[in-house]
Regions:
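A short coil-to-beta-strand element that immediately follows conserved catalytic motifs
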Residues: 49-51, 100-104, 166-177, 237
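Conserved FAD-binding catalytic core of PHBH/FMO-like flavoproteins
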Residues: 85-152
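C-terminal helical "tail/cap" subdomain of flavin- and related membrane-associated enzymes
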Residues: 222-301
């Protein structure tokens, strides 16, 4: 839908950082189509899909996982919880809860001949955004500042932002969604693995979670395959080794978030005098935050 070659980071009306890179630092997709593509590919690979109403209970029976739903019990060797920030699997199998949940409102604004670049607008809640697609913009506002004292944003805040930026109140398909960002210390227990937002693996700087969701899902699956292929290999240990590296990365993002949202004026000048270009170039070249900061790839091994 769109490759973000040009990006704007706005700290105020007068303080804006404009960055660009030919490769583009991120690619915009239609989420429904993105999810549908991977779902269809998964089914093609042999996965069986079953729609259920509600999971009532998840239990460990010896070395198996028992899942009770719709009056039935399903037994499996491993359970992967990929059910988002409000994960039922997480709630039924662990004491891991989000202390300061972050969330966002997002809607669609028609382009109508305009051509806004990808833009992040930082504010007292976290940031608002404009993400261009082919025929519309994804426009949203999120409370990325994870604090019990921070004010909850509302749909009214989104309407105010759209009105100020586009001079119109016309915004369609408004949705509200949570973002799982508190998995800095998450470790898999037994043979139940959480991935993506269910494990709190979205980064806390900008709230991006798709990359880590795909990556953690990939490693959870491959760790199970490796354990089936080698009796001496523990899927849990392999997945937790991956999580150790990934959560170190998340902790680095959290440090960055504290600087960005706690000291916006300093952040502006840091980005203006070199750090912004360093990040733009690094992300456009597919580097992690650790690699951008000069460290080796956390997934090199």
């Amino acid at each position: 839908q769109h490759k973000a070659q040009d990006m704007v980071f706005s700290f105020s009306e007068k303080r804006k950082i404009k960055l660009n890179h030919d490769k583009g630092s991120c690619v915009m997709v239609i989420r429904d189509k993105f999810d549908e593509f991977f779902f269809n590919e998964t089914v093609k690979a042999g996965a069986v899909f079953k729609k259920i109403n509600k999971i009532n209970k998840i239990r460990l029976i010896e070395n198996k996982v028992a899942i009770d739903f719709d009056g039935k019990t399903y037994l499996c060797d491993y359970l992967i919880g990929a059910d988002g920030a409000n994960s039922v699997v997480r709630k039924l199998t662990s004491d891991f809860n989000y202390k300061n949940p972050v969330f966002a409102y997002e809607g669609l604004v028609e382009k109508n001949g305009t051509n806004y670049p990808t833009e992040f607008i930082f504010n007292k809640h976290g940031y608002a955004w404009i993400f261009p697609k082919r025929n519309h913009y994804n426009v949203g506002i999120g409370n990325l500042i994870s604090s019990s004292k921070s004010k909850n944003i509302t749909k009214k805040d989104l309407h105010s932002f759209v009105s100020d930026r586009f001079g119109s109140n016309k915004i369609e398909d408004i949705t509200a969604f949570p973002i799982g960002t508190e998995g800095d210390h998450y470790k898999a227990q037994n043979n139940i693995f959480l991935v993506g937002d269910a494990a709190g693996l979205a980064e806390s700087l900008l709230g991006e979670g798709i990359y880590n969701a795909v990556l953690s899902g990939k490693f959870a699956g491959s760790s199970i395959v490796d354990s089936y292929n080698n009796d001496d290999v523990s899927a849990k240990l392999i997945y937790n080794k991956f999580l150790l590296h990934l959560t170190d990365e998340l902790k680095l993002y959290r440090k960055g978030a504290k600087i960005l949202y706690g000291f916006p004026r300093i952040s502006y000048w840091m980005m203006r005098f070199g750090l912004g270009k360093k990040f733009m170039d690094g992300y456009s070249e597919g580097k992690t935050l650790s690699e951008i900061m000069g460290k080796k790839s956390i997934f090199a091994n």
